[in-house]
């Protein structure tokens, strides 16, 4: 295919040179606007592979219909905080302090960029809105969603009394920001004498807390928060599903791109072209309000493609830049997110050799790993342990004689942060609960032969079986291709 096309272009170019056409064409071309990269990609998007998408199973427990919103609404945050307060009340706690940005985002909806600058969120049971400690660069952002007051320091490291934006420029003493936080909470007021915190305090922090807030006990309630975050609400799952609509279309575009351009392109080009095309689709559909804050938060589709020996490394330290060739393993992978919700979506391919045949060893690894995906789907039932799911998958891998190609556990929990506990691992005895979300990665890797096959999706735990968020097939028709 590639040679024929190159020959046609070469012969056509010679003819144009001979006829003196090229010079005139260049003059005309210089006066015409050329299509942008995005427009060129739109023009070649055939949608052919989208016709192979799986239809939803009417007997399955999901996936849910996609959300029609771009992020979780403020009412959801308020209901979530109310649920958290009820759980705290069961332990006799009337106030909470969270310092993990993931917990702040989950509870309050305050999406922000995390750096070395500490931020914290405090709330009493009787407070209607959260109180924040925040740096100066976020002073507008923190007030734009749900704000009940707070204390601002200028930046890290903060000098006492220094607020250049107010015209106060001075080299004051370096401020201990944990003491700054405690002093702000003291002035705000604490309901009760116990504060739930999202992690244990260091002994040095406990000493400072005892001095600033005498008689107040700090209680680790991180187990409540991670338990809430692990079990997704219907609103979270609907937003998650929406992100996969775009993720699936990206997979179809990448597959069509490979089938169209074959061995003329690199894996890097496929990834970049697909990423540009699908994010143009995504951002054109979202309500971005001309760049206003709180619109389009944490929304993006990232596509990564690798071909050849790099597929044999679970977490490569080399770039994905290799020309696509026949007889190779290929992976199209990506991570999607709308309003922070979405996850991985990987498919493993085998490219036929020059004779149009598929390597038997690759077929074996591909088939066993694909079967493990289906096993995880069926085993993802409320009430079983993570360890049990991992045990059954690893036992199957050993029975099939592919144990030397096993490098890692079958899956990890999935959340806004990406990897989230619990883990489908032999040593994790956490009980699966309905609406927990997991990746799907029973990969097999053969570095000696330069091939590897790993998958992913979002598997949501159900009452009778799990369900997937993606509608991209796992079939030979989709994944075994000839170029």
Residue ranges and their predicted role:
Residues 2-483:
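Active-site neighborhoods and metal-handling regions in enzymes and metal-associated proteins
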């Amino acid at each position: 295919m590639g040679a024929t096309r190159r020959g046609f272009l070469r012969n056509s170019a010679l003819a144009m040179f001979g006829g003196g056409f090229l010079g005139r064409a260049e003059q005309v071309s210089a006066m015409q606007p050329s299509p942008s990269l995005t427009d060129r990609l739109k023009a070649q998007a055939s949608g052919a592979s989208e016709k192979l998408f799986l239809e939803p199973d009417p007997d399955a427990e999901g996936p849910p219909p996609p959300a029609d919103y771009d992020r979780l609404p403020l009412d959801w945050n308020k209901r979530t905080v109310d649920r958290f307060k009820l759980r705290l009340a069961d332990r006799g706690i009337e106030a909470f302090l969270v310092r993990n940005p993931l917990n702040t985002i989950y509870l309050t909806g305050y999406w922000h960029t995390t750096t070395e600058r500490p931020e914290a969120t405090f709330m009493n049971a009787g407070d209607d809105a959260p109180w924040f400690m925040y740096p100066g660069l976020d002073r507008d952002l923190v007030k734009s969603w749900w704000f009940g007051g707070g204390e601002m320091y200028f930046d890290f490291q903060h000098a006492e009394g220094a607020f250049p934006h107010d015209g106060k420029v001075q080299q004051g003493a370096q401020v201990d920001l944990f003491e700054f936080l405690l002093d702000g909470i003291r002035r705000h007021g604490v309901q009760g004498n116990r504060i739930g915190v999202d992690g244990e305090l260091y002994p040095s922090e406990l000493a400072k807390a005892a001095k600033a807030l005498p008689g107040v006990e700090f209680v680790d309630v991180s187990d409540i928060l991670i338990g809430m975050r692990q079990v997704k609400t219907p609103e979270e799952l609907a937003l998650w599903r929406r992100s996969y609509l775009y993720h699936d279309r990206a997979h179809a575009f990448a597959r069509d791109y490979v089938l169209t351009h074959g061995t003329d392109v690199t894996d890097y080009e496929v990834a970049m072209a697909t990423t540009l095309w699908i994010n143009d689709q995504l951002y054109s559909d979202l309500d971005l309000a001309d760049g206003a804050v709180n619109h389009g938060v944490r929304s993006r589709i990232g596509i990564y493609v690798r071909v050849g020996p790099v597929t044999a490394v679970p977490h490569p330290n080399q770039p994905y830049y290799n020309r696509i060739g026949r007889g190779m393993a290929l992976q199209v992978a990506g991570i999607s997110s709308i309003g922070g919700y979405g996850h991985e979506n990987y498919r493993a391919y085998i490219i036929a050799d020059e004779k149009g045949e598929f390597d038997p060893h690759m077929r074996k690894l591909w088939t066993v790993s694909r079967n493990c995906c289906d096993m995880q789907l069926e085993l993802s039932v409320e009430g079983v342990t993570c360890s049990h799911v991992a045990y059954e998958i690893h036992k199957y891998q050993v029975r099939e004689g592919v144990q030397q190609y096993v490098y890692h556990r079958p899956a990890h929990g999935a959340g806004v942060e990406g990897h989230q506990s619990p883990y489908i691992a032999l040593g994790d005895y956490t009980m699966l609960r309905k609406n927990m979300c997991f990746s799907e990665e029973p990969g097999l890797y053969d570095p000696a032969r330069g091939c590897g096959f790993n998958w992913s999706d979002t598997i949501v735990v159900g009452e009778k079986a799990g369900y997937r968020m993606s509608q991209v097939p796992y079939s030979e028709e989709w994944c075994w291709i000839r170029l």
